[in-house]
Swiss-Prot record:
Cytoplasmic-side segments: 460-486
Lipid tethering residues (S-palmitoyl cysteine): C458
UniProt source species: Human T-cell leukemia virus 2
Protein name: Envelope glycoprotein gp63
Keywords: Cleavage on pair of basic residues, Coiled coil, Disulfide bond, Fusion of virus membrane with host cell membrane, Fusion of virus membrane with host membrane, Glycoprotein, Host cell membrane, Host membrane, Host-virus interaction, Lipoprotein, Membrane, Palmitate, Signal, Transmembrane, Transmembrane helix, Viral attachment to host cell, Viral envelope protein, Viral penetration into host cytoplasm, Virion, Virus entry into host cell
Motif (CXXC): 221-224
GO cellular component terms, A-Z: host cell plasma membrane; membrane; viral envelope; virion membrane
Coiled-coil boundaries: 337-383, 393-425
Length: 486
């Protein structure tokens, strides 16, 4: 068994398992592993496909009541942010200040609202990220190459797609999560002629679409409208929403989600409908699309094994075993000595008690002798009446004092020879006292030696790896771009 153990120890020390650390990106139940990265090689890279991410999001949505989005006719440029952020510069060169919120609290289809300043994504103070040093990416149609600093692994991110004129590609259903309140009357076109021009038909469609959007989201969303692009929009997707026929409203087609006709560029919205104010204001709004949130988790690298000299380990384990055995033997001997002294003291107490009982027995015998003498004297006095018992008409009593129990107690062997010492087992085996003690000590040393052989190498490895762990804990992550000082 010892040869098998040392052969296993030799194979583990000379053939360590090498595995590099990675960062895992999780969407639904799908996992995407990055390229090998670590504090010394801090760039984690993924090659992602937007269509696959969309499928993962649709099959396994991260939130139970999240409104899903539809497909769109072309892939737009991406903006990559930490989970819910403010972006002061749209050229991708400024700081990205994360403001973390729960993505499952989304309630709006979020038409025309600015993603990073919308009402339900209020900012929360948190550390800043820089685009080129902490996170960056490149895109070719639907393929995205994502690069993340290893120190940011473990955070959450969201991909935002900049879709010109169209916020976002949510699919609006006709069954809201809770019954909406009574809708206010639809705004008349005549009240908006100074804002919405030049097409009355498109104006009516947009207003009706805003109204249906507000109803489906329980009037908790902001809807934005751009005046300059109303005449150039075209129908992209028609959701299956039933429209109740009202005599006061015009007959229109199904409301449509729209995009500006190519080659329009991203533009700021100029007018926004505020549900709380129930009016269209001239706030500046931007547009974006929210793709599924990402959950990042670092994969800890396995502990590296160093090559060690087997003879040193053998001698060290043997020395530990011998030392432990000697310590166990000394401890066992001291324990046996203390047990013997305790038995001797108990034996002395028993002998004293026996002597006291014997003395009391002797005193009782003397008293019995005196009583017998008095009995004989009384019998002589009542001899003419037939004796004492017949004279007092009582049953005669005779005293029989026995010394058997005391003699049995005195004849028993000493307590040390009758009590089993050690582990509570019957170690008699017909051996002498010193032979039994030697047998117990030998078995104790053998058991301790086996324990040291089994657990000694593991303890040694942990002790040798402790300085390296402490050193790695105090190392700071290096940055992709040292000039950013992040």
């Amino acid at each position: 068994m010892g040869n098998v153990f040392f052969l296993l120890l030799f194979s583990l020390t000379h053939f360590p398992l090498a595995q590099q650390s990675r960062c895992t990106l999780t969407i639904g139940i799908s996992s995407y592993h990055s390229s090998p990265c670590s504090p010394t090689q801090p760039v984690c890279t993924w090659n992602l496909d937007l269509n696959s991410l969309t499928t993962d999001q649709r099959l396994h949505p991260p939130c139970p009541n999240l409104i899903t989005y539809s497909g769109f006719h072309k892939t737009y440029s991406l903006y990559l942010f930490p989970h819910w952020i403010k972006k002061p510069n749209r050229q991708g060169l400024g700081y990205y200040s994360p403001s973390y919120n729960d993505p499952c609290s989304l309630q709006c289809p979020y038409l025309g609202c600015q993603a990073w300043t919308s009402a339900y994504t209020g900012p929360v103070s948190s550390p800043s990220w820089k685009f080129h040093s902490d996170v960056n990416f490149t895109q070719e149609v639907s393929q995205v190459s994502l690069r993340l600093h290893f120190s940011k692994c473990g955070s959450s991110m969201t991909l935002l797609v900049d879709a010109p004129g169209y916020d976002p590609l949510w699919f609006i259903t006709s069954e809201p999560t809770q019954p909406p309140p009574t809708s206010p009357p639809l705004v008349h076109d005549s009240d908006l002629e100074h804002v919405l021009t030049p097409s009355t038909s498109w104006t009516t469609k947009i207003l009706k679409f805003i109204q249906l959007t507000l109803q489906s989201t329980n009037y908790s969303c902001m809807v934005c409208v751009d005046r300059s692009s109303l005449s150039s929009w075209h129908v992209l997707y028609t959701p299956n929403i039933s429209i109740p026929q009202q005599t006061s409203s015009r007959t229109i087609l199904f409301p449509s989600l729209a995009l500006p006709a190519p080659p329009s560029q991203p533009f700021p919205w100029t007018h926004c409908y505020q549900p709380r104010l129930q009016a269209i204001t001239t706030d500046n709004c931007n547009n974006s699309i929210i793709l599924p949130p990402f959950s990042l988790a670092p994969v800890p690298p396995p502990a590296t094994r160093r090559r060690r000299a087997v003879p040193i380990a053998v001698w060290l384990v043997s020395a530990l075993a011998a030392g432990t055995g000697i310590a166990g033997g000394v401890t066992g001997s001291l324990s046996l000595a203390s047990s013997k002294s305790l038995l001797l003291e108990v034996d002395k107490d028993i002998s004293h008690l026996t002597q006291a009982i014997v003395k009391n027995h002797q005193n009782i015998l003397r008293v019995a002798q005196y009583a017998a003498q008095n009995r004989r004297g009384l019998d002589l006095l009542f001899w003419e009446q037939g004796g004492l018992c017949k004279a007092i008409q009582e049953q005669c009593c005779f005293l029989n004092i026995s010394n058997t129990h005391v003699s049995v107690l005195q004849e028993r062997p000493p307590l040390e020879k009758r009590v089993i010492t050690g582990w509570g087992l019957n170690w008699d085996l017909g051996l002498s006292q010193w032979a039994r003690e030697a047998l117990q000590t030998g078995i104790t040393i053998l058991a301790l030696l086996l324990l040291v052989i089994l657990f000694g190498p593991c303890i040694l490895r942990q002790i040798q790896a402790l300085p390296q762990r402490l050193q790695n804990r105090h190392n700071q992550y290096s940055l992709i771009n040292p000039e950013t000082m992040l």
